[in-house]
């Protein structure tokens, strides 16, 4: 078989195989720069795009009402309840881990992913990537009304 014809047959097959594997990149984080925050900066009510809220209290507890969370590859997951939260940071960004007192019925025994802190202008954000990274699920983004 001539080389040109063999190449013409191989290229479409390779293209199909690559597209079947999904995206080459994951969804980018929301707009904003990573920021390190003090625990006192986090103690407020954070709101997601659908009106869900996460109220972080100074004593390390929280109250959530239908707030978006990222758990494994589940998408569009909202969680209500109470629990505890912890603050952590690396060299450039703070993170908030939440632990609910009761399991979500869809994800028994799994913990939500940590939220990362961002700042866009004067707006503070907490965010987590949602769902399968090969799909275009929107990120879970919480904003602070105090910002």
Each language-model region and where it sits:
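Beta-sheet ligand-binding and adhesion/scaffold domains
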Residues: 24-33, 52, 63, 92-147
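Tryptophan-anchored aromatic micro-motifs
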Residues: 28-53, 85-87
């Amino acid at each position: 078989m001539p080389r040109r014809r063999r190449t013409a047959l191989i290229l479409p097959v390779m293209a199909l195989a690559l597209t079947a594997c999904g995206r080459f990149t994951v969804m980018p984080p929301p707009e904003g720069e990573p920021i390190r925050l003090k625990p006192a900066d986090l103690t407020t009510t954070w709101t997601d795009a659908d009106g869900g809220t996460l109220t972080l209290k100074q004593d390390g507890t929280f109250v959530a009402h239908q707030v978006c969370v990222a758990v494994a590859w589940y998408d569009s997951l909202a969680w209500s309840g109470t629990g505890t939260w912890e603050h952590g940071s690396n060299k450039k960004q703070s993170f908030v881990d939440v632990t609910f007192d009761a399991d979500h019925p869809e994800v028994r025994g799994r913990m939500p992913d940590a939220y990362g802190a961002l700042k866009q202008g004067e707006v503070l954000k907490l965010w987590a990537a949602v769902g399968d990274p090969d799909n275009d699920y929107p990120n879970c983004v919480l904003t602070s009304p105090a910002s």
